[in-house]
Amino acid sequence: MAKEIKKIAVLTSGGDAPGMNAAIRGVVRAALNEGLEIFGVQDGYYGLYHDKVIPLDRRSVSEIINRGGTFLGSARFPQFKDIEVRKQAVKILAKYEIDALVVIGGDGSYMGAKLLTEEFGYPCIGLPGTIDNDIVGTDYTIGYQTALQTAVEAIDRLRDTSTSHQRISIVEIMGRHCGDLTISAALAGGCEYIIVPEKGLDKESLIHSIADNFRKGKRHAIIAITELMTDVHQLARELEEKFGHETRATVLGHIQRGGSPCPFDRILASRMGVYAVDLLRQGFGGRCVGIQNEHLVHHDIIDAINNMRRPFKQDIFEAASKLA
């Protein structure tokens, strides 16, 4: 029989994402409504290792649902890969008699929760908090929709100036090795060309396509590309030399992570926060939460990381390509 849960801690780890505060708020208030004690860990796994644990109450999470970032703070802490570091983290949790941990973050954060579950049998629930939308077991991650809105707004503005100056604009969008954000932003922003990790970069094909469109009377172009695929400034120089059109690269960068979360992310994060507490109350641990076909679901976090694969959004890519 699972141990009764009386105290829960929550942390945010890795890159911040709009909606993390809403998720923290959901966990905190749901826990308090169940009569549980709730703690916050500042600065992610780094803070857990360094005993940065604070008690939380309802007022701790007042007026944060609309705020971007994470009021608990976040940090990347690669040292957590060391089992001795994880042992110390478990000792800190035991010091406060914390029975379970809710981790909000991306795949690196999930890996930390997986190891705590796998090695120590410690009850962890993972909530997908990343703008990259690259987490298995969920259609959407917390922060993705807000980042998409930010990217589309940037593309809209670039289209105005690109059209006016007959310019080629290259827009680098976050996502690491996942093209979801780029594909959706390209479709919503009407980009002429889409380059994502799942399909690769074929410069010759890109040049041929741009040349063909210019011959047909096209006077400008917007290229959406996922980060880390190439040096976009070098690509801009190559295209300008090839076509004689002014070509500029814009790296959206961390602006995509900031800003007030959109309603979708606030709702998703709040629902997931409540759901995480419900799962712990039901005796579940070692799970990761997702939303699939509009329904909240949970998966074994070890199985999810080891065996599940994130499907490529082929239908959206094809639609964006056909409409380019």
Curated annotation (Swiss-Prot):
GO terms for cellular component: 6-phosphofructokinase complex. It is found in: Cytoplasm. Allosterically activated by ADP and other diphosphonucleosides, and allosterically inhibited by phosphoenolpyruvate. ADP binds at R25, G26, V27, V28, R29, R159, G190, C191, E192, K216, K218, R219, H220. Mg(2+) binds at D107. Pathway: Carbohydrate degradation; glycolysis; D-glyceraldehyde 3-phosphate and glycerone phosphate from D-glucose: step 3/4. Its EC number is 2.7.1.11. Keywords: Allosteric enzyme, ATP-binding, Cytoplasm, Glycolysis, Kinase, Magnesium, Metal-binding, Nucleotide-binding, Transferase. ATP binds at G15, R76, F77, G106, D107, G108, S109. It is an enzyme of class 2 (transferase). The active site is at D132. Its cofactor is Mg(2+). InterPro entries: ATP_PFK, ATP_PFK_prok-type, PFKA_ATP_prok, Phosphofructokinase_CS, Phosphofructokinase_dom, PKF_sf. One of its GO terms (molecular function) is AMP binding. It comes from the Bacteria. It catalyses: beta-D-fructose 6-phosphate + ATP = beta-D-fructose 1,6-bisphosphate + ADP + H(+). GO terms for biological process: canonical glycolysis; fructose 1,6-bisphosphate metabolic process; fructose 6-phosphate metabolic process. Homotetramer. Belongs to the phosphofructokinase type A (PFKA) family. ATP-dependent PFK group I subfamily. Prokaryotic clade 'B1' sub-subfamily. This is ATP-dependent 6-phosphofructokinase.
